[in-house]
Amino acid sequence: EYNPFGTNTQSLYVYFETDSAVKVSYTIHVKEDDIADFSRNVYQDEEYQKEHEFQVIGLIPDTENTITFYITNEDGSTDTKEIVYEMGSLYGEEAVQLDTDVKQSADKLEDGLYVVLGNDSPSMDFMYYYDNNGVLRGEVPLLGYRSHRLIFDENSMYYSISEKKMAQVNRLGQVTKVYDLGNYKLHHDYVFDENGNMLILATDTTQDSVEDIVLKLDVNSGEVTEVLDLGDLFGEYKKTCVKNSSDELDWMHINTIQYIGNGSVLLSSRETSTIIKVDNIYDGPVVSYMIGEKDFWKDTSYVSLLLNKKGDFTIQGGQHTITYETDESLADGQYYLYMFDNNIGISETRPDYDWSSIGLKVSSAVDGKNSKYYKYLVDENEGTFELVDSFKVPYSGYVSSAQETGDNVLVDSGLKGTFTEYDADHKAIVTYKMDYEKFIYRVFKYKFDGFYFEKSE
């Protein structure tokens, strides 16, 4: 049945039973020569089973799709069944085939689908799934605003569907719960802790300031609690800030949250170009330390919280999508932290600070030479951070994302409307270009193994 739950316009719901236990895969073929076949192995609870219920994704709009199901028995023999489905039109205006600039063999790309989050537009909002050929394989309608990332638990996928709502969706594409955040608006990011609670970046609409709250959502009960107000931790600094050009007191502008265990989180503050570690988030939050520019914080009581910069490099400016990464080769108390370093120097709420004095000379959203992928080694024992890897990427003063995927790095330069997957030597493999009205907010790659598709070994 075509898209019965309304959550992906390029999907089919499939159900059938077999006499013996089998596993299932499918291939979607269209007659258009420039669109390659799309093949996936279906997720099942058991490797071989008799009852089969799943979602086929990847149909091509406005054309006849030939879907071949491969039904494989435990002895390895395979039966096939073919259906033809003519899909109608997309809801949105997005391209079915992105413009691509292929620099190296596409075999070097990691497996997965590029999920384009927030191609901001005044009309209907969507999440898009594109394959490695730049072909659209999923159009996921939202109520409004944007999704910020996909997060998963054992049986569900979660994403934001409006400024005040999160959705829980199962493997079939059925919305199983919608969570309402009440007086709070979500923004930018959300993450699970080790107990399956969701931490969500938010604005308290009853307060004078924005984007400075963290909420806890219990996904079982739907209960929403405020666990952190940065105004409580940085009250003295908040008093010195002024409203920005949108007449908002966006004094911190937290744009990423990473949960790192034991009640500790890392927060990325775009407005202060600072990364903040907060401990005890559930019972008396305290700032453990910060990674930022000492000169920016020098006349405040918070300067003593800054880690020491080790080596000679320009600090991150207006960074996005900080990502916490552990490695067995590192000592306890050490970790990697990588990010999209927008390489912009601006704080509208602190207009007197001259970012160019510390090397961040560009304050324009679009007119910079380049942004960067930055990777720090943070050493909590020594109280230091050092730049261990970086490379230049197309400039975007705001939004954007970086994601390590396998040995590669995926970078979205949001205000350019492009995303590129780079190899382990930081050489571009393929760049994809989208039509966009304002920007592409983020692009992350997901394999969907264990969700839509079979778990990889």
Predicted regions and their residues:
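Short alpha-helical hairpin
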Residues: H29-D33
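Histidine-/acidic-rich catalytic cores in large beta-rich domains
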Residues: Y2-I28, Q49-E53, I57-E457
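Solvent-exposed serine/threonine-rich low-complexity stretches and specific carbohydrate-binding patches
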Residues: D34-E47
